[in-house]
From Swiss-Prot:
Gene that this polypeptide is encoded by: petN
Function: Component of the cytochrome b6-f complex, which mediates electron transfer between photosystem II (PSII) and photosystem I (PSI), cyclic electron flow around PSI, and state transitions.
Residues in the signal sequence: none
Family statement drawn from the similarity comment of this UniProt entry: Belongs to the PetN family.
Protein's name in the database: Cytochrome b6-f complex subunit 8
Keywords recorded for this protein, A-Z: Chloroplast, Electron transport, Membrane, Photosynthesis, Plastid, Thylakoid, Transmembrane, Transmembrane helix, Transport
Membrane-protein topology: Single-pass membrane protein
Localization per Swiss-Prot or TrEMBL: Plastid, Chloroplast thylakoid membrane
Keyword Plastid: yes
Pfam families: PetN (PF03742)
Transmembrane region(s): 5-25
GO molecular function annotations of the record: electron transporter, transferring electrons within cytochrome b6/f complex of photosystem II activity
A GO-annotated cellular component: cytochrome b6f complex
Length: 31
């Protein structure tokens, strides 16, 4: 299994974006 640095960086960006988006929605719902 060969994962390039670009793929790993992109995966981290997608995870960070998803988590931040979920936190925004969660905060808007009043926790």
């Amino acid at each position: 299994m060969n994962i390039s640095l670009v793929d790993l960086t992109w995966a981290c960006l997608m995870v960070s974006f998803t988590v931040s988006l979920a936190l925004v929605v969660w905060a808007r719902n009043g926790f």
